[in-house]
Structures are given as structure tokens and as C-alpha cells.
Amino acid sequence: MKSASSEQSVERIENGHKKKRNRPQKQNRRSKQSSVPIEDAHVEESLDGRDSSRSKAKDSTSSSKQQRPNTDELEAMRASNVAFNSMPPMRAESGYPRRSASPLLSSPEVSKQLLSKSCPDPRACEQSPGMNGELFQQIEGSSQRKIFSSHWSLDAVTEALEKGEAFKALFRVNAHNRNEAYCKIDGVPTDILINGNVCQSRAVEGDTVVIKLDPLSLWPKMKGFVTESAAKPEGTNSPPEKDDKKARQKNGIDVVEGFEDGFSKNKSSVIGKGAKNGVTPSSPPSLDSCLGSFCEQKGNCSAVDKLCGILSSFPHKRPTGQVVAVVEKSLVRDSIVGLLDVKGWIHYKESDPKRCKSPLSLSDDEYVQLMPADPRFPKLIVPFHVLPGSIRARLENLDPNLEAELVAAQIVDWGEGSPFPVAQITHLFGRGSELEPQINAILYQNSVCDSDFSPGSLTSLPRVPWEVPEEEVQRRKDLRDLCVLTIDPSTATDLDDALSVQSLPGGFFRVGVHIADVSYFVLPETALDTEARFRSTSVYLMQRKISMLPPLLSENVGSLSPGADRLAFSILWDLNREGDVIDRWIGRTIIRSCCKLSYDHAQDIIDGKSDVAENGWPALHGSFKWCDVTRSVKQLSEISTTLRQKRFRNGALQLENSKPVFLFDEHGVPYDFVTCSRKGSNFLVEEFMLLANMTAAEVISQAYPASSLLRRHPEPNTRKLKEFEGFCSKHGMDLDISSSGQLQDSLEKITGNLKDDSVFVDILNNYAIKPMQLASYFCTGNLKDSVAEWGHYALAVPLYTHFTSPLRRYPDIVVHRALAAALEAEELYSKQKQTAIDEGRSCFTGIHFNKDAAESIEGKEALSVAALKHGVPSTEILSDVAAYCNERKLAARKVRDACDKLYTWFVLKQKEIFPCEARVMNLGSRFMTVYISKLGIERRIYYDQIEGLCADWLEATSTLIVDKLYSKRGGRGFFKPMKEAVYLVSPCEVCVAKCSALSVHDTESPEAVSIDEVAPAVFPLTIQLFSTIPVVLHAVGGDDGPLDIGARLYMSSYY
């Protein structure tokens, strides 16, 4: 197992590292600070009655021509340059096993009344008279109460897609402003803006939708597009409450106070104003004539090509459109985590005695609102009659702790007449301010299976103690006399890779990478294989691991533990001093590791520290001595440095920032964090793992060009990359974006001039990461006519896959099987051709691939027989496996990011305040975005409409002057208290705090950050782009709202 730091250097580029920053919402519990970056697509758990919501949207209504909002309204729309576009669509294979339902969650009435099609069963409305019936009348589609237009029928969708009048896309919501959503169309470089609830037409984050584009004349200007005229600075947009109001008016929705904040279904609560009867008609109108004219100029081309041509001709325009159908519902609909608005319901009940004789009584025709923790989701309506009995009883008893409990819900219906989806509660986790409930909610939300392994999957495991069978000794290459060692984190137990090096005559080296042969134990189509495929990846939390494979395999018989005979897949390269591969050998082996080194141990050896065999160092096994180990580590370090330099000369790109490492007490509770960076020993291991992955990709793609699992990383988003280039040019930095290698070279030159400003280097890397797209697994058969798209942009190589971590990644097991099949095909071919074994064994896995042998009748037969024996999947099956593994890998990363945010929040909650320095990244009249280097996060600070604070924005010089008002503001308007933007202390308090810190500071934790390191600023404060300012971080939410990390200016004043 590799540590998060060692393994993620490539992953940081592969996964794009998209940052998402939340915009404040005017809703209950919605934080006004941005969130820690998380990313996206999930496979959800199986709960009672949830399968129906997983299926594609088959229900549709009759179509009629759809009317659009007027031109003035649409031209008023403004786009947002959010950083989470270019995310690949994902789907789960329905055949994979699901976890069993929680006994808490069953609600028999739901299946009868709520799990409906596009319109609910009228009988459900008859059983719920009064206010609840009025709501369901709206959902049923009363012509005077419709908000959303009917979705197109399946036939209309199919016809529009075939004619190029509509596009299939992935629906993503702006976390800063839920009224803004973006749709990613495959092959189109710019995302489509879907502005407003009506245009979004009940689509939810992660849905696969069909969209209809607006005419070109209605597309707004691209935000951030720089022209010769003075561009409007970022952050100068109107206040969010005004934006929200405009968005509702533009899209024909007026959500009155009774429904927005109340708890009854009022007949007049929602009034559509955009079209007749509040509904825009719904049949597919023709595409803008500009598409047709472009096609006439360019000849016969696809609709995507036409759209790309228009976007290229009008780069300053942001395309807009509307959702006309939801063709595949996102699985995240089934696991939305949030808090019940119990106080709001109680206030509603007590505010009018006519509604209820007693505030304690519950009526089935009422509902309670659920406020999602993720701001991308709308409020949910949970009818009382579908509440689990335990929650309903607590509501009746006015349990004050209920509102602090994290719950999960699934959307069961969203009718055309309801502004919010109807949901049911599926799980109760515990208090939102506690660590364990939050972790459980994170795992549940991302469908991470934390249950025990099934009995069937355990039956195929070998019994312990286990020894290598004699038949394997006979058929494998015996490397037990070779000095093989592992380098891993000190706490690692699943050791899936080992290294060796030998000096050869003539100054050559033979380097070996030995990977645990997991495919020997996990056979295709077994219960264990099904379980591993379902879990897909191990998930690493700070204090525990959720394994993909049972511990008996991942930590015992499959792990390359020191002193034990283990089965391995080995790749041996003969390298010269320039790092060129002269020859190679690939095969199944038996190895015996002589020691388990930690990264710190290996680094001490590289640094030449003496007395390496002192206390605390690992035991040696076999006949080897410490001089053998130290010589191997130093040689490997020198060779890896040569390989690394060569790789970057060939165009590789590396972008990474330092990240905090958490310190835990004996109870596993985080209490502080320190910053750490990767060591040379991390790069040592990384370099050889990259070489092994590239070698495996080359072999399997040549042997099985239609059914190999590779990993591709597309080129960055062109528009965003050009924006980054313009940003650097504006600030006097030359950036070459013509290739990954040129980008790396120019970044190194820029950062070389900034050696004394590591924070700005981090900011520059953050900007460089944002244009990067996600890396993903794919089946070569799906791109057989587009071999150029197989490449990996960040690594600058044409072929790449994952081979080196089969104990924790299912794709690696798939690759092992293909490699085993190629090896066996070589043996079969040599027997059929009656050639020498050395000549035959080199034809498919050697450094020179024998294409003639592979295309011969004997070669084809050998490859086919071997593929069948080792379970090499077909193109169709492998495509589904790739898509599912992409989804699970993304979910695992979300869990990791969410846990990082949770641990940070928990530390800040205990500290109460955390003063630190921040660097201003964006600046405007309403808010600034700051980068906190100690935590590697970005945060927004809003300072508009703050009582007692004056924020003067000087647009000509892009300067902000923040001062304190010493008289109350005149005029009307809502102003937030100063404490929301400024943490204000007096100079006397600062002196007292410093003295207290000196007396009570924990001397046992010298790495901990204390309050006396950062001094507050004074009024007036002048701020420009890249200014360093003091801020105070604090924990937001917990028991009373979603978790977040808030930032405020840290100021000092006597008044």
C-alpha cells in the first residue's frame, strides 16, 4: 500500500484536482463560506423501494411546442466560471450486489403513495385530504399550478437526438448558486449554462439529461472573457439575494413566503408567470438557424461538430439551454444527507393556533423540510405520513436533539407542480457535531460498502498457515535469493509492491518491480471476484481502512510481507546509465522480501545517515545484511532520479501542493495539523511504479487491442488554459501552454523566480490545476479508431494503465489477467510453432512485439484460448467495468476529501478560532477569495452589506479599502452583523492572548500552530490582488447546519 502522499502525486493530475467554492445561499442552514473541494458521481446503496429511482426515466408526457423566456430576460443571464466542469458521466452495472436495507428505514406507505411515475396515483391524494392533498394536486399537474414543463416523450427525445436538435449531457450544479447549472456534452469544450429552476426542469446533480440549446442571439457573454475593453473585475457581481430574485423572476417562478418557509401546502404558494398557466409548452423546437448555416459552410458534419464550430467562432459567448428530459436519474438522489428543519416546523405550528389545536399533534397532511448538507441540492419535502416511526415519535415529544441529527433521504417524486422534491427518510446517523456520525454519513452518501465480506466470498480464500504450492514453484521463476525489499508507510499492512536492483557488467542495472499476484487468488466469475468488483477500490480514512479484499488476502497471504514466500508478477528491466530500457522480462515469480522499510527509513539511507541498524529499524530476513539493503536503496534512488529527469524532459507535468497532516490523540480524535511535503523516497517508489504501469499498458494493448483496460488523461480545457495563460501574462509571467512539457518547463522557470514565495507557487499550481480534466479508465475497443485519445496528458505517454496495486484496486486485477493471458499465449504459440522457449516467450511480452506472430493463425488461436482461460472480458463487459471503476474511484476520492474537511472542521471546533495568514486570489466589490497555505484551501470572505463596515472598491486600480464605520448606516436595507466578516479584537486582548499562549501552550506539540504567530491588521486595511492578510478560521455548522469552514478578516481596533 502506498501512502496518500506517495500515490497521489500522479492522482492529483489524473483526477484534475478541481476546486469548488460555495456561494452563499439565502436559505436556512446554508453557510456563507465556501466548501472544501470535493468531487463527483456515486453508486448508491440498495434500500427498500429504491430500485425504481435508479432506472432510466422512462416516463414522459405528450409533447407540444415549448415557449422560451423573452430575449431581455435571457440576455440578463450571467454565467459562472465554476471549476467542476469536464466530469465524465458514470453509470453502475445493475448486476453488482447491493447492500441490504437498514431496518430503521422501512416505510410501507411510501411504496403505495410516493414511489410513483411522473404523476402519482390519484388514490394517494384521496387518502391525504386537506393541505397535503393540495400539494399532491399540484404534483398531479393541475394546469393552473404547473411550474415545470412536461418532459419530452422517449420518441421525441430519440428523434431530436438523431436530428441534432438536442444533446445528451451530464447535469452539474454550481455549489455557489444552485440557480446555475452546467451541462457537459461529450466532445464540446464549453459547458452549457442552464440558468434557473424552470430551465433545469427538475434535474438533479449528476443526472444524465437531454438539453435543447437556446438561439445564439440569446447566449450571454462568457464570464471572465477578456476583451480589449476593460473587463469587469471578478467579484463585482450583484449581491446574492438580488441574483436569486432575478433568477426566479427570469424563469417565471415566484415562490411566496408561505411555501418557502412555511410547512403547509398552500394553493397559492407557487405561481408561474413565464407562460400561459405558468407552464411553457413542451415539444422540441428546431435548433437555431446558425447551426444549419454553419453545416452548409462546412459540409456534412455532426451536431457536435456544428456546435464546436459555432463556439470557436464566438468564444466570448456562453451557450445556454434548457433541460427537456431526464434520461438517467443520478444515484445520488437516493442518498442525500442533511438536517430536518424541526424548529421551523414548530414555529409554523405555534404561530397560528387555527392550524392545530395542540402544537404537539402531528397531521399526516403536513410535512417537514430537509435541508441538504450539499448546497447543490434543493430543499426536500418529507411528508409526515412517510416518516419512520422513531423520528415521528421524537417529533411528537419535541425532542430538541432531533434537529441536530444527520439523516439521509431519497427523492421519490418531483411533480410538475411542486417547487421541491418529495422525499423519504432512509437513515439516521447521529449528531452532526460528532466525528463518527459524520464519517458514516460520508460513507453512506458515497455508497462505500463498509459491511462484512459475504460468506461466499470467503470460501475461496486459502487456509492459513499458507505455503506456496509445489506446482507453482515448478512453473514460476524463483527469485527468493534476490535482495527484494518493500518501501511503504510505517503503518501499512497491505504490501502489494516490492523492488530489487542488480548491477550488471558494462555499467547496466537490472531493476525489478514485483507486484502481489492477486489474480492467482481472485479467479474470474467467483463470489470473491464479484465482491471485489463491487467494492472496486479500498477506501483509506485517516484512522482506518475499508478494504476491497478480505484482510486474510490483503494483509496476509497476498501481501508481500518480509521473510515470507509470496507469489508475484514481476517485471525486470535492463537499464543503461541514461535510463534507457535495453531489455525486459515479464513473468510470474516467487519472491521473499528481506525487509519492510518505511519512507522515513529509506530517506535516511538516501541521506547517508549513519547507524541505520539502530533501535526502531525493521528486522532483516534471509542471508542479507544491512549493507545489501543500503546499497540497493541508494542505487534505486540514483536510477529513479535519472528516470524522473528523463520523464520530464519528455514532456511530463507535475502539479502538487503541500497538504496538512492531522495529529490524532490516543482515542483517534484529531487535535491539530502540521504541513508536510513528500520525500525523495516517495519519488523513488513512484518512478518505478510508473514505469511498470506503462510497460503493462504497452503489452496488453498490443496483445489484446480490443479488450484492454487502460487509463487516459485528456488534454486540459482549452478555454480555461488560455485564461490561465492570460492571467500569467497580465502579471508579467511567460507561460507556454502548447504542450504538457512546455507548460511544465515554463512553470518551473516561473517558480524558480519565486523560491522565496512558496505560497504564491502554491497559488500558481492551483490555477494550473483547474483546467485539467479527469483521468479515467477505458476499454481500448471503444476507441479503436481514435488511438490518439488513448494517451495520458500529464505523464506525456501514449499508453498507461494501473498494474501495481491489485490488493486495493480492481482494475489492476483485470490488467493482471490480461498480462497472464499474454504470457500463456506466448507459451502456447511456442509449442505450436515448435520454437525455442526463449524465442517464443519474447513474442508478445518482450521489448519488441512480434506483430506477425500475433496476426498469424497460430498466434490468434493462442491469444484467444489464453484470454478465455484467464477471463479477459469482452469489449462490452470491459466498458461497463471501466465505467463502474471510474465511478468508484471518484467516490473514494470524495470520501477522502470530505474526511479531510471533517477533520479540519473538528480541529477548528476545538480551537474555536485559528488565526493564520492568507493570500488574496480574487478581489471585487462584494467578496474576496483567499488561499490559506497552512491548510491548502480557498475561502471566500463577503464584506458587502456588513453593518459597521465600509468596503470601498476602486475599480481603476483593483484596490479594496476596508474601514470601520463609526456611525450607523442610513437608509433602508438588510445588513449583516460585522462578526460575519470580521473577527475584531482590541489591542489589549491581543497582548493578553499572547501572554496566555506563552503560559498554557502545549510544549509537547511544538509543531502545533498557536495564536501568537499571526498579528491582526488595523483599520483602514488596503487590499490588492495577492496581498497577504491575517484571517481567522472557524468551524461552521455541526448540530445547527452543514459543516463548513468559515473565514473572517482578523482586525484590531480600540473602538
From Swiss-Prot:
Basic residues composition bias: residue spans: 17-32
Effect listed in the UniProt record for changing residue 705 to R: Loss of activity
Tissue expression as described in the entry: Widely expressed.
Family matches, as PROSITE patterns: RIBONUCLEASE_II (PS01175)
Alphabetical list of InterPro entries matching this protein: Dis3_CSD2, DIS3L2, NA-bd_OB-fold, RNase_II/R, RNase_II/R_CS, RNR_Ribonuclease
Cross-referenced SUPFAM superfamilies: Nucleic acid-binding proteins
Predominant localisation class: cytoplasm
Entry-linked Pfam families: OB_Dis3 (PF17849), RNB (PF00773)
Sequence segments annotated as region (Disordered): 1-109, 229-249
Keyword RNA-binding assigned: yes
Transmembrane segments: none
Composition bias, Basic and acidic residues: 39-59
Example of a GO MF term: metal ion binding
GO biological process, one term: nuclear-transcribed mRNA catabolic process
GO cellular component annotations of the record: cytoplasm; P-body
Subcellular localization(s) per the UniProt record: Cytoplasm; Cytoplasm, P-body
Keyword RNA-binding: yes
Enzyme Commission number, as recorded: 3.1.13.-
Cofactor(s) the protein requires to work: Mg(2+); Mn(2+)
Important for catalytic activity (site feature) positions: 496
Broadest EC class assigned to this enzyme: hydrolase
Binding of Mg(2+), residues: 488, 497
Purpose: 3'-5'-exoribonuclease that specifically recognizes RNAs polyuridylated at their 3' end and mediates their degradation. Component of an exosome-independent RNA degradation pathway that mediates degradation of cytoplasmic mRNAs that have been deadenylated and subsequently uridylated at their 3'.
Family that this chain belongs to: Belongs to the RNR ribonuclease family. DIS3L2 subfamily.
Record's protein name: DIS3-like exonuclease 2
Organism name: Arabidopsis thaliana (Mouse-ear cress)
Gene designation: SOV
